[in-house]
Amino acid sequence: MPINVPSGLPAVKILAKEGIFVMTEKRAIHQDIRPLEILILNLMPDKIKTEIQLLRLLGNTPLQVNVTLLYTESHTPKHTPIEHILRFYTTFSAVKDRKFDGFIITGAPVELLPFEEVDYWDELTEIMEWSRHNVYSTMFICWAAQAGLYYFYGVPKYELPQKLSGVYRHRVTKETVLFRGHDDFFWAPHSRYTEVRKEDIEKIPELEILAESDEAGVYVVANKSERQIFVTGHPEYDRYTLRDEYYRDINRNLKVPIPANYFPDNDPTKTPVLTWWSHAHLFFSNWLNYCIYQKTPYKLEDIH
């Protein structure tokens, strides 16, 4: 999928080298089809790395996508240069009168805090409430999935005995367009200290569990219309993300396990094995095509 992003975004050069089609604004205006308008609320500390990971996946189908990057006004990013934020990102107050075909809310390293103690929780709940009637389909990733399930449906999160880190085998539990083309079993990364539980989700008639893992638990949950999709893992992670997180934690003297099913021979000095790439690309492609492009109104103002 050609993606139309602001000129000068660092991700553009990297993705172009990988063969991802990044379209200039001048070329984009000459296409007759309406581009999909996708909003990304980037809550991850390393925003540039997350941009690359998500844009890589959004740029993998034949449709044109216009991407708008969003940050929270109530929290000042500490790990990304403010110049980058001011140049490439916008605020909720600047977009709240617009409508979007799709919306991605990323994970965030705040999962051990009660939701209400997260410093941008009030702003996030305002944004999530806004998404009900101003976005056709929203994908919540990792902590955002827990936050969305809690805010919309009252699903609690639970602290795990130790960090869940690694790549785990999952199975599709319900046939749906999101998993069209998937094998019955596939692999996906997780990196978190908390979980949502199957028994809590099964009590809510509006929700369906679409994929799960014996080791990592619930993976993908969606409402009946698939306009809200909750992903408890990190399919967007690249080959080295779990490795980098592991060494970061070790350097902080944290007691964390070696990421499971990731390093050959469970040896952190060896190059990690990439086993989830086809799932990640197909999952995002299916979301864009089946959950958004084939269902969203042609006129954005008709989204409600």
UniProtKB/Swiss-Prot annotation:
It is found in: Cytoplasm. Keywords: Acyltransferase, Amino-acid biosynthesis, Cytoplasm, Methionine biosynthesis, Transferase. The keyword DNA damage does not apply. The record marks S191 as: Important for substrate specificity. Its EC number is 2.3.1.31. Belongs to the MetA family. This is Homoserine O-acetyltransferase. It comes from Thermotoga neapolitana (strain ATCC 49049 / DSM 4359 / NBRC 107923 / NS-E).
